[in-house]
């Protein structure tokens, strides 16, 4: 995938399509737990958006635009997935007990949060990290 693709129309379309797919992935992430969606589906869509950028340009360009080490992202995701149920256990609740709380924001209404969102964020990070590590490994071997 190191060849330079000079198809400008495909590259512009890929940027727009990748943005829309990533936006839909973030929307599904925040809709999760109460409605269909969540970390896994959101992670798949974010990985799809990054893969479209890698196909339209190349992997090196994608790595310049998104300079994340996806292997570390897997570890961050697993840390969130393990820390979320352990946090409720350390507070004397049953393992994996969900908690709701509000984060007060100055001049705005408080933001309602719950602990499943942190677990879903861990799943999202693990899915994006795993898929993008596989895509980059396959793409660099060619």
From Swiss-Prot:
Q: What is its main location?
A: membrane
Q: Name one GO cellular component term.
A: plasma membrane
Location in the cell reads: Cell membrane
Q: Which UniProt keywords apply?
A: Antiport, Cell membrane, Hydrogen ion transport, Ion transport, Membrane, Sodium, Sodium transport, Transmembrane, Transmembrane helix, Transport
Q: List the disulfide bonds.
A: none
**Can the keyword Cell membrane be found in this entry's annotation?**
yes
A GO molecular function annotation here is: monoatomic cation transmembrane transporter activity
Any Gene Ontology biological process: proton transmembrane transport
| Membrane topology reported for the UniProt record | Multi-pass membrane protein
**Stretches that traverse the bilayer:** 12-32, 37-57, 72-92, 118-138
Does Iron show up as a keyword for this record? no
Pfam families cross-referenced by the UniProt entry: MnhB (PF04039)
Superkingdom of this protein's organism = Bacteria
Q: What does this protein do?
A: Mnh complex is a Na(+)/H(+) antiporter involved in Na(+) excretion.
PANTHER family tied to this protein: NA(+)/H(+) ANTIPORTER SUBUNIT B (PTHR33932), NA(+)_H(+) ANTIPORTER SUBUNIT B (PTHR33932:SF4)
Q: Which family does it belong to?
A: Belongs to the CPA3 antiporters (TC 2.A.63) subunit B family.
How this chain assembles, per its entry, is: May form a heterooligomeric complex that consists of seven subunits: mnhA1, mnhB1, mnhC1, mnhD1, mnhE1, mnhF1 and mnhG1.
This protein is called Na(+)/H(+) antiporter subunit B1
What is the species of this protein? Answer: Staphylococcus haemolyticus (strain JCSC1435)
């Amino acid at each position: 995938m190191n060849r330079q693709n000079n198809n400008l129309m495909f590259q512009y379309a890929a940027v727009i399509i990748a943005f829309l797919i990533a936006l839909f992935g973030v929307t599904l992430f925040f809709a999760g737990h109460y409605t269909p969606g969540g970390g896994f589906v959101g992670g798949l869509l974010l990985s799809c958006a990054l893969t479209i950028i890698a196909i339209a340009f190349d992997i090196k360009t994608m790595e310049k635009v998104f300079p994340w080490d996806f292997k570390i992202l897997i570890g961050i995701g697993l840390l969130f997935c393990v820390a979320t149920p352990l946090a409720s256990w350390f507070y004397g609740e049953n393992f994996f007990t969900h908690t709701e709380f509000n984060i007060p924001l100055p001049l705005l209404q408080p933001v309602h949060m719950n602990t499943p969102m942190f677990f879903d964020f861990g799943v999202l990070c693990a899915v994006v990290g795993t898929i993008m590590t596989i895509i980059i490994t396959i793409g660099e071997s060619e």
